[in-house]
Amino acid sequence: MSRGRFSYSFQNFDPERMARASGRDLRISPKHSVELLREIRGMMLNDALRYLDDVIAKKRPVPMKRFNDSQGHKPGKGFGPGRYPVKVAKAVKKILLNAKNNAEQKGLDVDRLKIIHAAAHRGPVLRGYIPRAFGRATPFNEQTTHIEIVVEEIRR
């Protein structure tokens, strides 16, 4: 579902020191995306990729700080409510690798890249329904999410 051009919510983008990537209309949970991106924002790019690999392997949970109603605590010292959003982690990893390749194409040092902006926005709802008995129907909608990542080469 391509809708043409879009703009990033990140302001003051410097093309000399920064690279960016985005995923549009992804069929992943907006709530899990917000929680996961909060966790990787501010990380070095390579550390974030390792963290996402651990989430996909269900070794490290993602802390749920906002959307945590009836959420079980996860093992670990002082760890509260958390989950393993594997589907979201795979999608975010793809976008991070895209940002890494974009930075490499610009000639930036990929070992010094830091995630300075990671945001998730709700996308359009894909409407569907399930036919029920006696001519009724139950809505069966699917949420979509827009994700944007900006990385910056930090100076030594």
UniProtKB/Swiss-Prot annotation:
Gene3D superfamilies: Ribosomal protein L22/L17. InterPro entries: Ribosomal_uL22, Ribosomal_uL22_CS, Ribosomal_uL22_euk/arc, Ribosomal_uL22_sf. It comes from the Archaea. One of its GO terms (cellular component) is cytosolic large ribosomal subunit. Keywords: Ribonucleoprotein, Ribosomal protein, RNA-binding, rRNA-binding. The keyword DNA damage does not apply. Coiled coil: none annotated. GO terms for molecular function: rRNA binding; structural constituent of ribosome. Belongs to the universal ribosomal protein uL22 family. This protein binds specifically to 23S rRNA. It makes multiple contacts with different domains of the 23S rRNA in the assembled 50S subunit and ribosome. The globular domain of the protein is located near the polypeptide exit tunnel on the outside of the subunit, while an extended beta-hairpin is found that lines the wall of the exit tunnel in the center of the 70S ribosome. This is Large ribosomal subunit protein uL22. The gene is rpl22.
